[in-house]
A protein has these predicted regions:
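Divalent metal-dependent phosphate-bond-processing catalytic cores, especially two-metal-ion Mg2+/Mn2+ enzymes
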Residues: 20, 39-137
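Short alpha-helical scaffolding segments that buttress acidic/His motifs in well-ordered protein cores
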Residues: 28-36, 53-56
Length: 137
């Protein structure tokens, strides 16, 4: 809870000790504060730079290990074939919808789409394999 705002409070003294200009410290801290839920506990202007903190966090979260971690958390291996198929289809739909998410920069958007395409490719392959199976235990 309040992960972004607490992280900004931790980062602020460090950034100030680096001797960065106050505007730079505020912009970095604002980006950190809003990166989870778009809320900060201080006023600042939202800039593409601020948005890159959340963008980087989201892009980083969509990697190969997270696929494994998610499937483990869902206890995917214990699901029936039908439940697995439903979960995979709903995941693909969700990932396709994520492509519409607004990001702060063109580069972030390209990286985001690459990560989503990687995930979608994995889940489409998993779906194809399950669709050709009569049972997967």
């Amino acid at each position: 809870m309040n992960h972004g705002r607490r992280s900004a409070a931790i980062a602020r003294p460090f950034l100030e000790n680096l001797g960065l200009p106050a505007d730079a410290v505020n912009e970095i801290c604002y980006g950190i504060a809003i990166h989870v839920d778009d809320e900060a506990d201080f006023e600042w202007k939202r800039t593409p730079f601020c948005e890159t903190v959340g963008d980087a966090d989201n892009i980083d979260r969509f990697d190969a290990y997270r696929i494994y971690e998610t499937l483990e958390y869902l206890e995917f291996s214990k699901m029936s074939l039908g439940d697995k198929q439903e979960k995979v289809v709903s995941t693909i739909e969700k990932l396709i919808n994520f492509k519409e998410m607004k990001l702060g920069t063109v580069t972030a958007k390209k990286l985001w789409i690459q990560r989503l395409d990687y995930y979608i490719g994995f889940y489409e392959k998993l779906k194809a394999q399950m669709d050709s199976s009569s049972s997967i235990v």
